[in-house]
Protein backbone atom coordinates (compact mmCIF):
# COMPACT_ATOMS: atom_id res chain seq x y z
CA UNK A 1 0.00 0.00 0.00
CA UNK A 2 2.41 2.71 1.23
CA UNK A 3 6.16 2.41 0.66
CA UNK A 4 8.78 4.94 1.73
CA UNK A 5 12.35 4.27 0.61
CA UNK A 6 15.50 6.18 1.60
CA UNK A 7 13.53 9.36 2.28
CA UNK A 8 15.58 12.48 2.97
CA UNK A 9 14.40 15.98 3.76
CA UNK A 10 16.31 19.05 4.95
CA UNK A 11 15.35 22.60 5.80
CA UNK A 12 17.59 25.60 5.24
CA UNK A 13 18.09 28.75 7.26
CA UNK A 14 20.22 30.95 5.11
CA UNK A 15 22.92 28.67 3.76
CA UNK A 16 22.83 26.34 6.75
CA UNK A 17 21.29 22.92 6.13
CA UNK A 18 19.27 21.18 8.86
CA UNK A 19 18.59 17.54 7.93
CA UNK A 20 15.25 16.35 9.34
CA UNK A 21 14.73 12.97 7.64
CA UNK A 22 17.87 10.91 7.07
CA UNK A 23 17.12 7.88 4.93
CA UNK A 24 13.77 6.69 6.30
CA UNK A 25 12.46 3.33 5.06
CA UNK A 26 9.02 2.01 5.97
CA UNK A 27 5.89 0.37 4.62
CA UNK A 28 2.25 0.22 5.64
CA UNK A 29 0.19 -2.73 4.44
CA UNK A 30 -3.42 -2.45 3.33
CA UNK A 31 -5.75 -2.53 6.33
CA UNK A 32 -2.93 -1.87 8.81
CA UNK A 33 -3.11 0.68 11.66
CA UNK A 34 0.39 2.11 12.19
CA UNK A 35 1.62 4.85 14.51
CA UNK A 36 4.76 6.97 14.40
CA UNK A 37 6.21 8.20 17.68
CA UNK A 38 9.32 10.07 18.73
CA UNK A 39 10.55 13.12 20.61
CA UNK A 40 9.98 16.67 19.38
CA UNK A 41 12.16 17.36 16.36
CA UNK A 42 12.50 13.70 15.41
CA UNK A 43 10.84 14.26 12.02
CA UNK A 44 7.35 12.84 12.62
CA UNK A 45 5.33 15.70 11.20
CA UNK A 46 7.78 16.26 8.35
CA UNK A 47 7.41 12.60 7.40
CA UNK A 48 3.62 12.94 7.40
CA UNK A 49 3.79 16.12 5.33
CA UNK A 50 6.00 14.42 2.73
CA UNK A 51 3.63 11.45 2.46
CA UNK A 52 0.64 13.78 2.17
CA UNK A 53 2.28 15.70 -0.70
CA UNK A 54 2.13 18.99 1.22
CA UNK A 55 5.89 19.50 1.12
CA UNK A 56 8.49 18.20 -1.37
CA UNK A 57 11.20 15.82 -0.25
CA UNK A 58 14.83 15.96 -1.33
CA UNK A 59 15.68 12.31 -2.04
CA UNK A 60 14.01 8.92 -1.94
CA UNK A 61 10.79 7.37 -3.18
CA UNK A 62 7.22 7.37 -1.85
CA UNK A 63 4.61 5.16 -3.50
CA UNK A 64 0.93 4.82 -2.61
CA UNK A 65 -1.10 2.04 -4.15
CA UNK A 66 1.66 1.53 -6.70
CA UNK A 67 1.75 5.19 -7.76
CA UNK A 68 4.89 7.23 -7.18
CA UNK A 69 4.28 10.47 -5.29
CA UNK A 70 6.34 13.62 -5.69
CA UNK A 71 7.68 15.51 -8.71
CA UNK A 72 4.12 16.22 -9.88
CA UNK A 73 2.38 19.44 -10.76
CA UNK A 74 0.06 20.94 -8.15
CA UNK A 75 -3.07 19.80 -9.99
CA UNK A 76 -1.93 16.16 -9.86
CA UNK A 77 -0.90 16.44 -6.21
CA UNK A 78 -4.25 18.01 -5.30
CA UNK A 79 -6.04 15.15 -7.05
CA UNK A 80 -4.12 12.59 -4.98
CA UNK A 81 -4.88 14.47 -1.76
CA UNK A 82 -8.57 14.72 -2.63
CA UNK A 83 -9.13 11.22 -3.97
CA UNK A 84 -6.60 8.90 -2.35
CA UNK A 85 -5.86 10.44 1.05
CA UNK A 86 -7.99 11.24 4.09
CA UNK A 87 -6.82 13.63 6.80
CA UNK A 88 -7.50 14.02 10.52
CA UNK A 89 -5.76 16.83 12.41
CA UNK A 90 -5.37 17.85 16.03
CA UNK A 91 -7.69 20.78 15.34
CA UNK A 92 -10.99 19.43 14.09
CA UNK A 93 -11.22 21.69 11.00
CA UNK A 94 -15.02 21.61 10.94
CA UNK A 95 -17.11 24.37 9.37
CA UNK A 96 -19.14 26.06 12.09
CA UNK A 97 -22.02 26.98 9.77
CA UNK A 98 -22.66 23.40 8.65
CA UNK A 99 -24.28 20.57 10.59
CA UNK A 100 -22.31 17.51 11.64
CA UNK A 101 -23.78 15.53 8.74
CA UNK A 102 -23.00 18.30 6.25
CA UNK A 103 -19.42 18.50 7.54
CA UNK A 104 -19.00 14.78 6.93
CA UNK A 105 -20.32 15.16 3.38
CA UNK A 106 -18.40 18.37 2.53
CA UNK A 107 -15.66 16.64 0.44
CA UNK A 108 -18.38 15.13 -1.77
CA UNK A 109 -20.44 18.33 -1.77
CA UNK A 110 -17.43 20.24 -3.12
CA UNK A 111 -16.88 17.63 -5.85
CA UNK A 112 -20.58 17.29 -6.63
CA UNK A 113 -20.53 13.56 -5.92
CA UNK A 114 -22.90 13.19 -2.97
CA UNK A 115 -25.70 11.20 -4.61
CA UNK A 116 -27.27 8.13 -3.06
CA UNK A 117 -23.90 6.42 -2.54
CA UNK A 118 -22.56 9.40 -0.60
CA UNK A 119 -25.65 9.65 1.59
CA UNK A 120 -25.56 5.91 2.29
CA UNK A 121 -21.87 6.02 3.22
CA UNK A 122 -22.51 9.01 5.48
CA UNK A 123 -25.27 7.03 7.21
CA UNK A 124 -22.89 4.09 7.66
CA UNK A 125 -20.11 6.26 9.11
CA UNK A 126 -22.49 8.12 11.41
CA UNK A 127 -23.77 4.81 12.81
CA UNK A 128 -20.29 3.31 13.02
CA UNK A 129 -18.96 6.19 15.10
CA UNK A 130 -22.04 6.56 17.28
CA UNK A 131 -22.94 10.11 16.30
CA UNK A 132 -26.49 9.60 15.02
CA UNK A 133 -27.91 11.74 17.83
CA UNK A 134 -25.83 14.79 16.88
CA UNK A 135 -25.84 14.62 13.08
CA UNK A 136 -28.20 17.60 12.72
CA UNK A 137 -26.43 19.72 15.34
CA UNK A 138 -23.67 22.25 14.69
CA UNK A 139 -20.03 21.80 15.81
CA UNK A 140 -20.37 24.35 18.64
CA UNK A 141 -23.18 22.27 20.12
CA UNK A 142 -21.21 19.03 20.55
CA UNK A 143 -18.18 17.87 22.55
CA UNK A 144 -14.57 17.84 21.39
CA UNK A 145 -14.60 14.06 21.11
CA UNK A 146 -17.75 14.14 18.99
CA UNK A 147 -16.22 16.78 16.74
CA UNK A 148 -13.13 14.65 16.24
CA UNK A 149 -15.22 11.56 15.46
CA UNK A 150 -17.00 13.72 12.90
CA UNK A 151 -13.60 14.62 11.43
CA UNK A 152 -12.70 10.92 11.22
CA UNK A 153 -15.98 10.20 9.41
CA UNK A 154 -15.34 13.09 7.00
CA UNK A 155 -11.86 11.73 6.24
CA UNK A 156 -13.41 8.45 5.09
CA UNK A 157 -16.29 9.79 2.99
CA UNK A 158 -14.26 9.50 -0.24
CA UNK A 159 -13.04 5.94 0.51
CA UNK A 160 -9.36 6.97 0.60
CA UNK A 161 -6.53 4.50 0.13
CA UNK A 162 -4.80 5.91 3.21
CA UNK A 163 -5.97 7.90 6.23
CA UNK A 164 -3.31 10.21 7.69
CA UNK A 165 -3.79 11.43 11.27
CA UNK A 166 -1.61 14.08 12.91
CA UNK A 167 -1.92 14.07 16.73
CA UNK A 168 -5.68 13.35 16.49
CA UNK A 169 -6.13 13.15 20.28
CA UNK A 170 -3.89 16.08 21.19
CA UNK A 171 -6.78 18.38 22.19
CA UNK A 172 -8.91 15.76 23.94
CA UNK A 173 -9.33 14.39 27.45
CA UNK A 174 -8.57 10.74 28.12
CA UNK A 175 -12.15 9.48 27.65
CA UNK A 176 -12.63 11.35 24.38
CA UNK A 177 -9.18 10.24 23.20
CA UNK A 178 -10.09 6.62 23.72
CA UNK A 179 -13.37 7.08 21.84
CA UNK A 180 -11.55 8.61 18.87
CA UNK A 181 -8.91 5.89 18.75
CA UNK A 182 -11.65 3.28 18.95
CA UNK A 183 -13.23 5.03 15.95
CA UNK A 184 -10.01 4.40 14.03
CA UNK A 185 -10.16 0.76 15.10
CA UNK A 186 -13.75 0.52 13.88
CA UNK A 187 -12.77 2.09 10.55
CA UNK A 188 -9.99 -0.46 10.15
CA UNK A 189 -12.02 -3.53 11.15
CA UNK A 190 -15.38 -2.60 9.59
CA UNK A 191 -14.28 -0.66 6.51
CA UNK A 192 -10.79 -2.03 5.88
CA UNK A 193 -9.25 1.43 6.32
CA UNK A 194 -5.46 1.82 6.27
CA UNK A 195 -4.32 4.33 8.90
CA UNK A 196 -0.98 6.08 9.47
CA UNK A 197 -1.00 8.14 12.67
CA UNK A 198 1.53 10.50 14.24
CA UNK A 199 1.11 10.68 18.01
CA UNK A 200 3.03 11.53 21.17
CA UNK A 201 0.64 9.43 23.28
CA UNK A 202 1.72 5.87 24.06
CA UNK A 203 -1.81 4.94 25.17
CA UNK A 204 -3.25 5.89 21.78
CA UNK A 205 -0.38 4.15 19.97
CA UNK A 206 -1.01 0.94 21.91
CA UNK A 207 -4.21 0.42 19.89
CA UNK A 208 -2.16 0.17 16.68
CA UNK A 209 -0.87 -2.97 14.99
CA UNK A 210 2.64 -1.54 14.81
CA UNK A 211 4.55 1.49 16.08
CA UNK A 212 7.51 3.09 14.30
CA UNK A 213 9.78 5.11 16.59
CA UNK A 214 11.74 7.98 15.06
CA UNK A 215 14.74 9.67 16.59
CA UNK A 216 16.93 12.34 14.99
CA UNK A 217 15.39 11.72 11.58
CA UNK A 218 16.00 7.97 11.56
CA UNK A 219 13.97 4.93 12.53
CA UNK A 220 15.14 3.97 16.00
CA UNK A 221 13.01 0.86 16.40
CA UNK A 222 9.73 -0.75 15.31
CA UNK A 223 7.41 -2.60 17.67
CA UNK A 224 4.62 -4.94 16.60
CA UNK A 225 1.70 -5.77 18.86
CA UNK A 226 1.64 -9.49 19.47
CA UNK A 227 -0.54 -9.82 22.54
CA UNK A 228 -2.67 -7.78 24.90
CA UNK A 229 -2.88 -4.04 24.35
CA UNK A 230 -1.85 -3.36 27.96
CA UNK A 231 1.37 -5.33 27.45
CA UNK A 232 2.07 -3.45 24.22
CA UNK A 233 1.50 -0.17 26.07
CA UNK A 234 4.11 -1.13 28.66
CA UNK A 235 6.57 -2.10 25.92
CA UNK A 236 6.10 1.29 24.27
CA UNK A 237 6.71 3.13 27.53
CA UNK A 238 9.91 1.11 28.05
CA UNK A 239 11.23 1.96 24.58
CA UNK A 240 10.36 5.65 24.96
CA UNK A 241 12.27 5.68 28.24
CA UNK A 242 15.18 3.91 26.55
CA UNK A 243 15.20 6.54 23.79
CA UNK A 244 15.25 9.32 26.37
CA UNK A 245 18.11 7.70 28.28
CA UNK A 246 20.17 7.42 25.09
CA UNK A 247 20.36 11.22 24.79
Give the predicted meaning of each segment.
Residues 2, 7-207, 214:
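ABC family nucleotide-binding domain
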Residues 218-242:
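Conserved beta-strand-loop-alpha-helix hinge in the C-terminal portion
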Residues 246-247:
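Short acidic DE-rich linear segments
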Amino acid sequence: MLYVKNLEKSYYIGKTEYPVLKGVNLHVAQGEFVAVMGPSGSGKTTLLNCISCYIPYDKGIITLGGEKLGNMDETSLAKIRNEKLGFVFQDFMLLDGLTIRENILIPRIIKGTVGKDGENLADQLIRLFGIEHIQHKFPAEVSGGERQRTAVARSLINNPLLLLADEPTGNLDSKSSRNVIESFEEARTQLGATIFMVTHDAFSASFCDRVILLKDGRIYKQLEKQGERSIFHSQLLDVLKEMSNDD
